Amino acid sequence: MALDETLFGYPIYPKFKLGEPRFPQDTFLGRYLHCLDVIDPRTLFASNKKLEESLELLNSFKAGTATNVPDKSLWEAQKLKSAILHPDTGEKVLPPFRMSGFVPFGWITVTGMLLPNPSWPTLLFWQWMNQSHNACVNYANRNATQPQPLSKYIGAYGAAVTAACSISGGLTYFIKKASSLPPTTRIIIQRFVPLPATSLASSLNVICMRWNELETGIQVYEKDTGKVVGVSKVAAKQAVTDTTMVRAFLPVPLLLMPPCIMPYLERFKWVTKTQVRHIFVNAIVCTLSFAVSLPVALALFPQESAISREQLEPELQQKTKNSLLYYNKGL
């Protein structure tokens, strides 16, 4: 691959900039291409040695001692660092809770939530599994500039899971009790129950798991110097709001596509001949839908978001002359 090759008009490996995304973040397409880097599952297989080599290369570049190193190598090193280490703490994120592990480790729960005609225990079990995974991902990818005690996150986890199971169980109960609906209509509607349940529950999950940020605020900084100006509750509100919108949108294509696609595939006898085959095909459709919807949802807002100085608290406005300040939105 030629290094000057372009992708949708963007250079695939532009001049390397330390700490900057490979693609522009002021357009949806640029953010989408960046998110494909963020969720690349190949980074899950990187060894500790490979990570150390990447960090050494980036440190050498920062010190000005990395000479004749291709931009591609520098971008790949930064991609690996961003995929594995938390941007605020610098600590490793466990593979199941990285964005690159969201689909490989989350497809099982998504498939389980979309199983046809689930029993009450099955329904609640998969909602619990899904929201437990979401809660761990939210915690692992939070803005960590203001440390919080683990006890607060445990309480938030309980609230998120309770909300998810209550919403899903409540919707299913009312549909089953809707005797005026024909049985076929009830079955079709029941296939789409996970959509509003998961969308609402995922939004509440983010709010619960990141409530402490709203109370204490998050750090805002000058992008050109990296100087931390202070801690802002206004920025925290914007960060949590944007992330909540992302999580509310994520289940829409993910949970709409399989119920729309599976009825057509079920016309083939090979698919419905055995329950194992049906579950297998359903799992493939769910996984592909998950892989398609995740980068689209993440690209709605940039991870490193900007906020105008005028929007911040008065005491912070006096500490900088920059018109825009930045913060880590979290994922």
From Swiss-Prot:
GO terms for biological process: amino acid transport; mitochondrial transmembrane transport. One of its GO terms (cellular component) is mitochondrial inner membrane. It catalyses: citrate(in) = citrate(out). The keyword Transferase does not apply. GO terms for molecular function: monoatomic ion transmembrane transporter activity; transmembrane transporter activity. Its main location: mitochondrion. Keywords: Amino-acid transport, Membrane, Mitochondrion, Mitochondrion inner membrane, Transmembrane, Transmembrane helix, Transport. The chain crosses the membrane at residues 104-126, 153-175, 243-265, 278-300. It is a multi-pass membrane protein. The keyword Membrane applies. InterPro entries: Mtc. It is found in: Mitochondrion inner membrane. Disulfide bonds: none annotated. Belongs to the sideroflexin family. Mitochondrial amino-acid transporter. NCBIfam families: mtc (TIGR00798). This is Sideroflexin-5. It comes from Caenorhabditis elegans.
